[in-house]
Amino acid sequence: LVQLLAKAEFEIRKEAAWAISNATSGGSPAQINFLVQQGCIRPLCDLLTGSDPKIVTIALEGIENILKVGEEEAKPMNAQNQMAILVSEAEGLNKIEDLQQHSNNDIYEKCIKILETYFGVEDDSEMANLAPSEENNQFGFGAAAAPQGGFDFSGQ
């Protein structure tokens, strides 16, 4: 199944993506780990650049289910999510970040959830508020205004 997902013609890859996503949705952690060992992450990540929003969504759901298992396995040992590392190595993180610009709101929402939950990435709109502003060739970082009456450093 993973080989079909990776190398078959698009129509067959779509069906394989459905099957793998369904397996990650209802499968045990051992079954999901087996799919990962067989190499399902990279072909799922490759589907993220496709033009069919339904297949992109299916691939995102499969990746999210895999990341969830990785998180559950990492938590007791206070370790890194190995599945997140594998997704990053398969260029999945970059592709998920790029999908934040997708016109389909469901895809956008799923990407935000994955990035915030498994990669510690904040929503772009929140990050934009933290960007320095430039005025008169000087940068401002949105520092809070001084309290009325100024600061009191006398220690009283």
Language-model-detected regions and their locations in the chain:
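Long alpha-helical HEAT/HEAT-like repeat alpha-solenoid scaffolds in very large eukaryotic proteins
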Residues: 36-37, 41, 45-50, 142, ...
